[in-house]
Amino acid sequence: MCIRDRLKLVFEDYEADSGDKAVNAYNTLKDQGMQIFLGTVTTGSCLAVVDKSKQDNIFQFTPSASAQDVIANDNCFQICFTDPNQGKASADYIADNKVATKIGVIYDSSDAYSSGIYNAFKTEAAAKGLELVSEQSFTKDSKTDFSAQIADCKNKGAELVFLPIYHQQASLILTQSKNAGFAPKFFGCDGLDGLTSIKNFDTSLAEGVMLLTPFAADSKDQATQDFVKAYKAAYNDETPNQFAADAYDGVKILAKLIESQKITGDMSASDICEKLKAGITAADFSYDGLTGTGLKWNANGEVSKSPKAVVIKDGNYAALDN
């Protein structure tokens, strides 16, 4: 029997919550007999359940929770690259390609993902000689009105605003920046993926926005083209973003490991966890997927993966030339 016939995906919506809803969703999955945990999508919710999956010794494989604390336990591995790597890579790209020298930053101080990238970016920016002229924060309780943050960046002459945040808040910042007559360059990370798909957002404001992402839907390789075609057919012609691609790679990686480790459904979740940990860190294991080739994992749960720099052009991603 083919491996896909032996995999049963069960979903619970935790509503991007970093508290009780995330824990309740995890407990519901566990009560339904979960043997492998492919989750969560966001960092805050992942941090809410990592100790529970460790206590249960269930293998946890997160597609896109990128904080280093997510993989503090030995049962959790990331498909995405870590926040420090994104922050460092962003500062390096901006400095090495002379994109700008005077930088403003707007980040979510209440979010581990955003704060982690910001802290790494700040450290590397200093090492690269970039000037952070404005460092502005907001929290989960104040994420709709960005007029003060935008005004500070504008008044201090920011040539580029770095946005280590998610696309929902980025769309508001772009809209409010236009209304304030502020038109700097904007640069973000994988959280900006999906910016052009937000309902009721003037996507023309996203033109020229730069970001680092492991996946670009307009890539010409056959695997990406096949995935995009199938995804659009399944989801009302919606273009997949890196969140979808990371999750897809996650399922394929697990399938490969299940085969190589000879894992069967009658094994306990704990036994499966031990086999998956051994398999994914084995010297001879690697994976070529949508979000990178030759992917390998260390015992700390980190994946070796390099982000791609892209710019939004005509509503699509285009590779940024180095």
Please give the residue ranges for each predicted region.
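Extracytosolic ligand-binding ectodomains
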Residues: 1-322
